[in-house]
């Protein structure tokens, strides 16, 4: 930005009066030195001067200021203000440790409250906060029926002595798997239902267990796959035939013949 032709310069202070000759001298001695480095060294040298050494330059600065006020009575120092381009930083850069995208209404409801509200709830009513967190987690990972069962269990156990017992995954895993036994996605991931399996009558249809999740080993997926058959029945046999190969010559020894031989 170029200055106007009628621009009035600011009167020099004591340091500027002293450094005017010193700057010229230092620039002649060090022609490759940058002007900013020269100013830095001159400032350090000025601070080392005593009051007696600074007095002549202070008096000269006062005289120049008086002359400046006489020549320009309406002068007013107006420094140029740089535009503020820096954006204001948020108070909380990362309010939640993960993004709440999708249909996680339970976690969205928690994120709408501020950090102070959550802190007050944890300090004043820890059992209510623990129950709300358990219900929100159930709404995310289970269907509404399982979520309702988990919320009821959380509300029932809210008056226990330990308000944070709801976060114990090992103690609550059996309740979650029992309430989610009717989830239809168990058949879509490759596990047969217990009512339609080959050994449904043998196992009694009440076999329910969990499998570790492939993406998160710490999370267990409830499953209704059938268990192993009883030892009294012979499992069905299957043969893998490759091109150029036939049925194996040796048949497996049947269990019925083995029992008759005994």
UniProtKB/Swiss-Prot annotation:
Keywords of this entry: Developmental protein, DNA-binding, Nucleus, Repressor, Transcription, Transcription regulation
Taxonomic lineage of the native organism: Eukaryota, Metazoa, Chordata, Craniata, Vertebrata
PANTHER family: SOX TRANSCRIPTION FACTOR, TRANSCRIPTION FACTOR SOX-21
Gene Ontology molecular function: DNA-binding transcription activator activity, RNA polymerase II-specific; RNA polymerase II cis-regulatory region sequence-specific DNA binding; sequence-specific DNA binding
Pfam families: HMG_box (PF00505), SOXp (PF12336)
Transmembrane helix recorded as keyword: no
The name this protein goes by in its record: Transcription factor Sox-21
Cellular compartments annotated: Nucleus
GO biological process: brain development; negative regulation of DNA-templated transcription; negative regulation of transcription by RNA polymerase II; nervous system development; neuron differentiation; positive regulation of transcription by RNA polymerase II
Annotated organism of origin: Xenopus laevis
A GO CC term assigned to this protein in UniProt: nucleus
Gene name, Swiss-Prot/TrEMBL: sox21
SMART domains to which the protein is assigned, alphabetical: HMG
Gene3D superfamilies found in the cross-reference section: High mobility group box domain
InterPro entries in the record: HMG_box_dom, HMG_box_dom_sf, SOX_fam, SRY-related_HMG-box_TF-like
